[in-house]
C-alpha cells in the first residue's frame, strides 16, 4: 500500500494578536497591550499594510491551494473583527481564527489546526506578518520542496523539517532616496519560512526563534531567488532595521521586481 503523504499548506498571521510572547508584549500589562494594539490610528495603519502588501502577494500566488489563518484575540473590538472578516469575501483563502490570549506555540498550534482540512496527514505551515509579502511562486515552491522532503523521508510523522527561502527585499518606507535593499540572509527568517509536520504535531514554524530553527530541525534553505519583501515603516512591532550587509537596489528595478514577483504597487501603497 502506498504511504499517505498528503500535505496541506496553511499559513498563520498573528494580526494584532493580544497574546503572550510577542515583541510588543514582553514588558506590558495585558490592559496596556490591548490599548496599544487596538488604538484606532494603529489599527487603520495595520489594515492598510495588510490590504496593500500581504494580501495582494498571496492573492497572486500561482498555486492557490492554501489557507491563511488570521489569528486574533477575543478582546479585539468588534469593528476591527468585522473589517477583517469582510476581507474573506475578496480573498477566499483567508480565514479568521479567534482565540483567547495565550502563548505563541499554543495559540499558533490551534490556529494551524483551525485551517486543517481534516484529512491531510501533513501540514506545511508558514508564517507571515501583516506588513510583509511573499513572491507569487512561494506556495508552489514550498509545496514542491515539502513533497520532496516527505518522499525522501526527511520529514515524517516524528520528524519535522523546515523550508527557508532567505533572499529578499527590505523596503524602508520612510526613505525616499534609498528605500529598497536586497539581501540573502545568513539563515532562515520567520518570513518565507515554513515547517512540514504531522497534522497532530506539537511543533510548528513558531516553535523556535527563526535564528534557532536550523539548530533544532532539519532545514532546507534556498538563498537564490528573491522570495520576500520585508517592510520598515516606523511602527513595526519588532525591532527591524536594514541589515548592514544588504545591497542598495536601483529604485525603478526594485519597483518593477515588486510589481512582477509580488503583485505590489509601491507608489500606491505609500499614498494610502
Identify what each model region corresponds to.
Residues 2-6, 12, 186-272:
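C-terminal catalytic/acceptor-binding lobe
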Residues 8-13, 57-58, 66-71:
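Hydrophobic targeting segments
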Residues 17-45:
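A solvent-exposed, charged loop/short amphipathic helix patch at secondary-structure junctions
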Residues 35, 53-65, 90-91:
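Short, acidic, metal-binding catalytic loop of nucleotide-sugar glycosyltransferases
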Residues 35, 42, 72-80:
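A conserved acidic beta->alpha catalytic loop
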Residues 65-75, 98-100:
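Short beta-strand/loop segment that forms part of the nucleotide-sugar
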Residues 103-118, 133-218:
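Conserved catalytic core of nucleotide-sugar-dependent glycosyltransferases
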Residues 125-128:
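Short aromatic/hydrophobic "clamp" motif used to bind/position activated sugar donors
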